[in-house]
Amino acid sequence: MTQSWNNTSEQENFVLSLLGNKKGGHYVELGAFHSKNGSNTNRLENEFDWKGVSFEIKEDLRKEFNENRSNPCMGDALDFNYISYFEDNSFPKQIDYLQVDIDAGYKKNGRPDGSAYTSLHGLLAVPLNSYRFTVITFEHDANMYWRNDVMRDVQREILDSLGYSLVVRTESEDWWVDPKVIGLEEYRKYFRWDHL
């Protein structure tokens, strides 16, 4: 039976389902936005006792997040020493979940408000050669702006070359698993390839 997953909070359901409602996991969230509304990690932290670190460049959202959540929300995901943070906070080498969704939104004319490649830069900032992630969700918004097709494709090349398996592919997001941790028989029931 194929599962149907939407975006935003459904990412948490996808992660929890693949990991058997794991308690005490670890996450890294690039692009936190609000602490609860549209959050991809609120349930992980508050219902399943996950430890994690989030990033939000907008100061008002970061302040709101830090006032309402226990796990910290930092500023710039592109200028952060991930390895030191992970070591200082006892993150495992196999982190359960990486969420990448850092963009500044879109103007009325459909152009990005800032770089079209911020999420890709965020992915490249994470030490992918030193740490692995069991589940990765990457928002590329290829449906929003034509240049995002390039970002989507480069992200796919990077994660595929690192041995990750693409499980969910929509017009705006890609969801990946580490097949060294989650076997094909487990993740194949979640396959969803809506778009290139």
Regions found by a protein language model. Name each.
Residues 43, 50-51, 93-100, 104-196:
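Conserved acidic-Pro-Pro-aromatic motif
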Residues 84-91:
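Conserved amphipathic alpha-helix within the SDR
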